[in-house]
Regions:
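Iron-sulfur (Fe-S) cluster-binding modules
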Residues: 1-62, 71-84, 97-137, 141-206
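N-terminal glycine-rich "phosphate-gripper" loop used for MgATP/nucleotide binding
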Residues: 86-90
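Short, well-ordered alpha-helical microsegments
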Residues: 92-95
Length: 206
């Protein structure tokens, strides 16, 4: 199972301030605990500001074919928006980001793991369920899974010709992130301080 938890309200409003926003809710996998009431309350507050171009609630946006069919019905409202805010697990956010190449796509939730079935996650998108989602700083490409070293503060010095030094068949995750941020005009995100990933266990935090 997965648990999705809303990011801090301040973190979300800092992304949406002064922007037109299209919102996507995923109520898909029964294996995912989604904070519906909290999400609805926050979305109502955002809509009250008059900057929400539309809200789409669907299921299984981690399935690219299903997601594409659903999004096509809302494309005019999506094109009006400066930012697409996705309330889902990390895989859903990555799937939407890959499809909407010219849009800034942001995660409204962090994802946490619970042992058990993991839903219908396609293999080409991965979420490590780290509870500290970095997708908003990396253009919707997860540095934890796209980089073989799970680096969150930029490229290492070992990549060569765009390939990873650990796996020469693997494209450098941070080169992908750079290209994506350049494409959506967000290279400034690379200058922002990075919250280093916390690998401490629950027992160590007690």
């Amino acid at each position: 199972m997965l648990i999705t938890q809303l990011k801090a309200k301040e973190a979300i409003t800092s992304l949406t301030a002064g922007k037109k926003v299209f919102i996507i809710n995923c109520h898909g996998c029964k294996e995912v605990r989604f904070p519906e009431k909290e999400a609805a309350r926050l979305q109502k507050e955002l809509a009250a500001e008059g900057n929400v171009t539309g809200i789409m609630t669907t299921d299984y946006i981690c399935n690219p074919e299903n997601m594409e069919l659903r999004l096509k019905k809302h494309m005019s409202k999506i094109q009006e928006a400066d930012l697409v805010l996705v309330f889902s697990c990390g895989v859903g956010v990555q799937t939407v980001s890959e499809y909407l190449e010219d849009k800034m796509v942001c995660a409204a939730c962090d994802t946490y793991p619970v042992p058990g079935f993991q839903g219908v996650t396609p293999l080409e998108y991965k979420c490590d369920q780290c509870g500290e989602c970095y997708l908003n700083q990396t253009g919707g490409i997860c540095p934890i899974t796209a980089c073989s070293k799970s680096l969150v503060n930029g490229q290492c010095g070992g990549s060569k010709n765009g390939k990873c030094e650990v796996d020469s068949e693997m494209e450098c995750g941070w080169e992908r992130i750079y290209r994506r941020l350049k494409e959506i005009g967000r290279l400034d995100a690379l200058k922002c301080p990075t919250q280093i990933h916390n690998f401490a266990t629950d027992d160590e935090l007690k």
